[in-house]
Every structure is written in C-alpha cells, then in structure tokens.
A protein has these predicted regions:
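Adenine nucleotide-associated cytosolic modules
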Residues: 1-267
C-alpha cells in the first residue's frame, strides 16, 4: 500500500506517462516510487547510471554518498561527469546534474565515507529507515561494511559490481533472514589478495558499468514499485565478453558471522 493522500501532480503524470502505461505497472507502482527513499553508496561507474535511471523513473528521494573526487580516468564510464568537473566531489557534482534531470524529486549528496560508526547519521535513521540501499562501490572490504550496516539496521541491500567485461548483482533482504552478502562472498572478503583486483588495476569497459548500473536500477524499480524481489536468493552473473547472463542460487549460511550473529542482529 502506498502512503495515504499521496498523488501525482500534472507534471508527474506527463513525465511518467510512458512508464505508467506498462503492463504490470500502474499508478500505485508509480506512487510507491514517489514515496521511496533510496541511499546510493558510490557515485562512480555504477552509481552514475543507477542514480540517473532511478531519478528519471521518479524515485522520490535519492541520496548519494561518496568521499571521492572526479579524476580524468573516471570520464570514460562515469556518465554524470564532464572534463570541467575534474577535482570536484563526485557526490555533489552528480546530485547537481540529477536535480536538473528531474526537479520533481529530492536529491541529496554527502561527501563522506560510510562506515559502521557514522551510518546512523549518514542514513538519517532518525527520520526512519531508507527503503533500499544501493551498493555501487568497487571493493570487497567496503561492500562487506555496507552489508553489515544493512543487516544491523535491517535495510534491504542491492549490491552490484563490475570489472573488465563482467558484473554481478544481488538483492539481499535481511528482514526476511534469507542470507546476506557475506553468506555469498565471505571467503573472498577474507582473502586480501582478491580485494586487489579493482577497475584501477584490472580495467573495465565503459559499457560494463552502464549495463550493470542499469540492471541494478531495474531491480530497484521492481522492488520499490512492484514490491517484489526479482533476485530472491539468486546472484545474477553477467559476462559481456560472451554476451551471456545466468542466475546462481545461494542459501543463508547458518555460520555467517554477520547475519547469523545474535550480537549483530540485536544492535
């Protein structure tokens, strides 16, 4: 159910007309987007296309968190930035563009690195839990921290990754106790050597981040608008070099130190 007394304005009806015409997508779905609050961690190769699509689709509140500055090497794939933006904060620069793309929604940017100590404040938990976290970061250690925050505060987490010509995507719902990021990638997170493979040293094709960022946005729109998880206990694996995509099932790890820990769950 959407929140009471929420309606679409004439401008919103015109802007989202093609979306509302979709089979299986009605006015209630669009209204759910309007009342949704999404926090995106990482305003880079994944965060740029994901945030732009969500903003264009009508997600009512989009908050970007990133502590990095724009570099020349980012321009190849980070679609919200221009050469004149080099050395500017990613989060604030991206939000300025997003606000121009859709002035009918609320966009916020914070220059900070999200961690377990500042999560309550940065996620504005005093105002209530966000409806969805989007992990658009680029290393296992940071993703594991975001996962711990997701489990701690019981916030759904949509995690994407992209490197070279490959990508992965999963949507974890800690409130359903069906497993978390650590259940799937725990062994990799604990392997420091694996964390060294990043876009900076392994490369990434521009289209890879565009595809994965928009697949991430697609899953977010279905989750927020249609209240369904298209990836329940499934990891989507995309291989751009072979133009192949497959789904791999996973289960909750009963020994997971994150989502199976009574200490974490009770915080």
């Amino acid at each position: 159910m959407v929140k009471e007394m929420v309606q679409l304005s004439d401008d919103e009806l015109l802007r989202y007309a093609r979306q509302v015409l979709l089979d299986g997508w009605d006015m209630d779905a669009q209204l759910r987007l309007k009342t949704a609050r999404v926090v995106i961690i990482g305003a880079g190769g994944l965060g740029c296309p994901a945030s732009e699509t969500l903003v264009r689709a009508g997600v009512g509140y989009v908050h970007l968190i990133d502590d990095d500055e724009i570099e020349a090497s980012n321009l190849q794939r980070q679609t919200l930035f221009l050469p004149d933006d080099i050395s500017k904060p990613k989060a604030l620069t991206a939000v300025a563009i997003l606000a121009r793309i859709n002035p009918l929604i609320k966009t916020y940017g914070t220059v900070a690195r999200l961690d377990e100590d500042n999560a309550y404040e940065l996620l504005d938990m005093a105002a209530g839990k966000p409806d969805l976290l989007l992990d658009c970061t680029d290393n296992f250690a940071t993703r594991d921290i975001i996962n711990r925050i997701s489990v701690r505060y019981q916030i759904p987490l949509l995690s994407a990754s992209a490197i070279a010509m490959q990508g992965q995507l999963a949507l974890f719902e800690p409130q359903l106790d069906t497993g978390c990021y650590h259940c799937v990638f725990g062994s990799v997170v604990l392997d420091e050597a694996a964390d060294e493979r990043t876009c900076a040293n392994s490369g990434v094709l521009a289209s890879t981040t565009a595809v994965m960022g928009n697949l991430q946005a697609n899953a977010a729109l279905q989750y927020l608008g249609l209240t369904k998880n298209p990836l329940t206990n499934k990891l989507l694996i995309w291989d751009g070099s072979q133009m192949q995509q497959r789904l791999m099932g996973y289960r909750k790890d009963p020994q997971c130190p994150v989502c199976s820990s009574p200490i974490i769950n009770s915080l």
